[in-house]
Amino acid sequence: MSDAVQQHDVFHYNQAAWDRQARADCEWSRPVDAAEIAEARQGRVLARLTPGPLPAGWLDDARGLDILCLASGGGQQAPLLAAAGARVTVLDASAEQLAHDRVVAEREGLELKLEQGDMRDLSRFADASFDCVFHPISNLYVPDVAPVWRECFRALRPGGRLLASFYNPAAFVADRDPALMEQGLIRPRFSIPYADPAHLSEAELEAKRERGEALVFGHSLTELIGGQAAAGFLIAGFHEDWQPRPRFLIDRYLPAFIATWALKPA
């Protein structure tokens, strides 16, 4: 790991990276517009776990629910859920991502509770505080996902649901050399579980730092799905989705995203 990364723990390093991405108007940092909020006010749940819509039956009605949007700032999912009638709390590491939520809430007259913190530590919330945890693609920014699942289970009420999404681990296996993509070649280079600090060279880590990119961790299916079961959840739904704008060649051949609906037994 580069000296620049060693001087900070992963949380603070990625926190700063996401502040930069939010200011740069990345895909997950573009606040929803008034038309989307108006549609959500009709009771439609438009929040997304993956690029496509939520599968039918996963969260058809949000009215009156206490929902935690976990590591889900950016002015998108939380305002849409609040407009659909939920009481929404957002916890995110990035102040800039939370600022986007605040902008939409103030613009649309929505009530959001905004909290800055680490997705692995929900100790500020009492046991059984929420009916739903909405956790879109973000646990790749922590080295160990097990604490996330344990904290979600604790913070949910009996019968509550965890709606989570993450990258397909297979997306982390291939060498990302652009020259290989131009040749139509997929060359396995990395093993799973994957970790930027362990798998990238010093030069590659330094290049990521210079680009302002976060460190990522490709967790195994055992950690991502088995970990939810180990925390006490029952898996009620499974969904795969494709990358609409493939960044890597492998994205053209398999769904890049996985989403799960997990239940805390009543």
Would you name each region that the model predicts?
Residues 231-233, 248-266:
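Core SAM-dependent methyltransferase catalytic element
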Residues 215-238:
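Short alpha-helix
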Residues 131-146:
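A short SAM/SAH-binding and catalytic strip from SAM-dependent methyltransferases
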